[in-house]
Amino acid sequence: MHKTRTASIISLATLSLLLFTACAAPANHEVRPEVKSAQSAHAAANQQSTPEPTTEPTPEPATEPTAFTIAWMSDTQAYTAADSDVFGKMTQWVADTQAGYNTVLAVHTGDIVYNAFREYEWNNSVAAFAKLPKGMHILTAAGNHDQLPPENKETPYLNHRPDTDFDPAHAFDKTGLSYYMTFEAGGVHILVFSLAYGQELEASDWVNAVCKQYANHYAILCLHNYMDLGGYSSVGRRLIKSVIPQSPNIRVVLCGHERGMQYFAETPDDDADGKPDRTVHQMMMNVQDDAENGVGFLRLLRFDPAMDTIEVVTYSPVLDRYGYKVPVGGDRFGERKTLNDAGLRDFLTQEKP
């Protein structure tokens, strides 16, 4: 009995020692292959989920096209000759409303003054244009009243025009009378021509070449002599054949010279498939000597790329009146007129999806 209990105690002590030794000894077993594989895959996934640092700049998000406005004036010679403040009130209003309308360009389609020999008329025009805010593009197209006779090449117009973007490299010839400018507005590439009175026809090939060079730009043709109340002037009849069909990116033509306001739309068939491919919106404005109804009228052309429209607003800051009473035969735009098929979507600065 005593020997049996002693043997049992020794056996239990030996078993405890063996268990203690097994637990304290370092593990010496191999990890199963499938476990190794899972652990490696997990480590690789963690490594891939952490991107390497890059020095490439983050691209700017694409901006949505926004509406922008062109302020259009013409034939202000009666105002500058009379020493009146009408012209100045027009440009001051354009400046005051720039932010609300997002006005990016002020255009004058000629006959800024009545007599190009009179320095005081030029001084009046300079004072009026000076009211336009810095940063706004300004383009003028010389009219017949703005130029001295052909034999006198030193026309004061070149010394007094307020054009902000004139570049001799963009001029038709060494006189610098006709030229073009480019800029971006509202997400659209813009190309604007200034064609001086008397150079319209000889500059036709040049206009077509520039339009081809800037084929991705929305082209606006600004000149003095092009239309009248009944149709096209002799110059306009030539340009409608030599320029408009050859330059598919021309979508707007602005002119003055003849009395009244008028609108014609041309719809050229550019690919000769028997269907119109674009609309060319052509407008004429000259109401400066209508003492009763026309004092101080200008037009705002609001371009909306999203809607592909041009809203034409007719307003006189002098009379504080919208809508000009157009003589018989003229346009009937009234206070506001929306022109569809502006063609703006073809010339966006961001690629279309």
Language model features with spans:
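Active-site-proximal beta-strand elements of phosphoester/diester hydrolases
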Residues: 67-77, 187-198, 220-222, 280-286, ...
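Active-site glycine-centered loops adjacent to acidic/histidine catalytic or metal-binding residues
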Residues: 75, 110-111, 143-144, 224, ...
